[in-house]
């Protein structure tokens, strides 16, 4: 059983990595998609908004599907489908083909995100210590790899089909092979005990703090991904080349923060790590908003990555843990699926919110809005506390198997 858990952990990390590559390849080549299909500037926001909306629908559907199908089975099916949807988006010739491909991408990526995090929470429960940040570190690493591939494609003027096709040819077999070692909730339950309640349903009151924190974190994240380049160039008067750097630096610091974040949770506990992350992220927004020049602004975005990176993985972990302790594994899966919707809510709200405030006032002031929302995370930080016999603050469950 120890070997199965280790294999399950490694295979799930591969799945997170693959998804990071695929998602980065899509979002970094949006201008090329617009050119390929002749999407007007007026219509482009509709296409961009449709993906997270449909991803939310996919996440809601996943909550119902996992009542009949194990998350491991669902993940094995949807990850290749996401890769194929990416290829479809880059290979069509008519606008409706792009719409169908992006719709398929949105629906399947919602199921993929939900099922990956379900398995991550289940494995963390089986391990009896924090490992969730490591999975999200693999996603960040995949995002860096995908963005690098996108740069190569743009530099060498590769068509989207020539970029996406070979990438999918490599990633789909990797995902399929990794899926052989996924570990489902039954093994997690065997290793970590059974929840206090058998069945039941998760109350919205329990999930509300985590839903708000998830939305706040993704509002901050979407601010960086959508507005960092424009802010550096238009407000801080950087060069066009330098304006492309902040998001890459943000991704690297996100990777580094997540790579060591689990150690912080084991040593200091989830509450302390979430509070620290919120304070650091808020400090990053302050530096960005008050920056005197582009290099100071880049320091702010760097600090932002170190702060925001720990919040989302810990939100999934805490919500899943609380649901499991009260109702068992199946309700934990439902909680993750519902919570996952709010990452898309944050993504949808963040970009237009900052843009509207920036246009109506100024972009320095607009950067203070996600700062305030991230600071609001401090109000809900105690919700991340586990039971005394759970991991955190130097403790691991005595009954947890030693899985390395």
Predicted regions and their residues:
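Short amphipathic helix-loop junctions that connect adjacent transmembrane helices
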Residues: 28-42, 226-242
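Helix-breaking motifs and short loop linkers at transmembrane-helix boundaries and internal kinks
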Residues: 38, 70, 91-96, 237, ...
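Conserved MFS/SLC helix-loop-helix module at the cytosolic interface between two early adjacent transmembrane helices
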Residues: 57-92, 96
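Helix-to-loop junctions at the C-terminal end of transmembrane segments
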Residues: 58-71, 154, 257-270, 358-359
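Structural signature of the two symmetry-related core transmembrane helices
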Residues: 73-87, 272-287
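Cytoplasmic helix-loop-helix junction between adjacent transmembrane helices
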Residues: 102-137
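Intracellular juxtamembrane helix-capping segments at the cytosolic ends
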Residues: 111-125, 310-327
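Helix-loop-helix hairpin linking two adjacent transmembrane segments in secondary transporters
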Residues: 135-183
């Amino acid at each position: 059983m120890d070997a199965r858990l280790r294999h399950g952990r490694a295979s799930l990390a591969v799945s997170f990595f693959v998804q990071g590559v695929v998602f980065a390849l899509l979002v970094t080549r949006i201008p090329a998609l617009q050119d390929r299909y002749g999407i007007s500037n007026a219509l482009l926001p509709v296409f961009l908004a449709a993906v997270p909306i449909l991803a939310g629908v996919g996440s809601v559907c996943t909550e119902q599907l996992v009542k009949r199908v194990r998350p491991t089975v669902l993940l094995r099916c949807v990850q290749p489908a996401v890769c194929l949807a990416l290829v479809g988006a880059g290979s069509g010739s008519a606008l409706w083909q792009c719409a169908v491909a992006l719709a398929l991408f949105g629906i399947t990526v919602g199921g993929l995100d939900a099922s990956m995090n379900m398995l991550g929470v289940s494995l963390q429960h089986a391990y009896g210590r924090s490992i969730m940040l490591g999975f999200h570190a693999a996603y960040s690493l995949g995002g860096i790899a995908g963005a690098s591939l996108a740069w190569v494609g743009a530099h060498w003027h590769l068509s989207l089909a020539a970029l996406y096709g070979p990438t999918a040819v490599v990633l789909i077999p990797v995902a399929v092979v990794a899926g052989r070692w996924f570990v489902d909730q039954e093994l997690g339950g065997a290793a970590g005990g059974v929840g206090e309640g058998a069945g039941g349903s998760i109350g919205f009151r329990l999930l509300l703090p985590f839903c708000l924190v998830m939305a706040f974190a993704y509002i901050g994240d979407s601010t960086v991904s959508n507005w960092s380049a424009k802010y550096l160039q238009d407000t801080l008067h950087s060069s066009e080349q330098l304006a492309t750097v902040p998001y890459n630096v943000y991704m690297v610091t996100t990777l580094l923060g997540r790579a060591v974040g689990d150690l912080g949770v084991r040593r200091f506990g989830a509450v302390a790590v979430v509070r620290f992350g919120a304070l650091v992220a808020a400090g990053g927004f302050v530096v960005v908003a008050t920056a005197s020049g582009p290099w100071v602004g880049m320091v702010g975005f760097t600090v932002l990555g170190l702060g925001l990176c720990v919040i989302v993985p810990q939100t999934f972990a805490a919500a899943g843990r609380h649901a499991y302790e009260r109702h068992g594994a199946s309700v934990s899966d439902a909680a993750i699926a519902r919570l996952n919707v709010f990452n898309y809510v944050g993504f949808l709200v963040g970009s237009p919110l900052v843009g509207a405030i920036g246009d109506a006032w100024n972009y320095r002031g607009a950067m203070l809005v996600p700062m305030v929302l991230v600071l609001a995370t401090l109000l809900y930080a105690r919700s991340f506390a586990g039971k005394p016999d759970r991991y955190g603050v130097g403790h691991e469950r005595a009954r947890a198997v030693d899985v390395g």
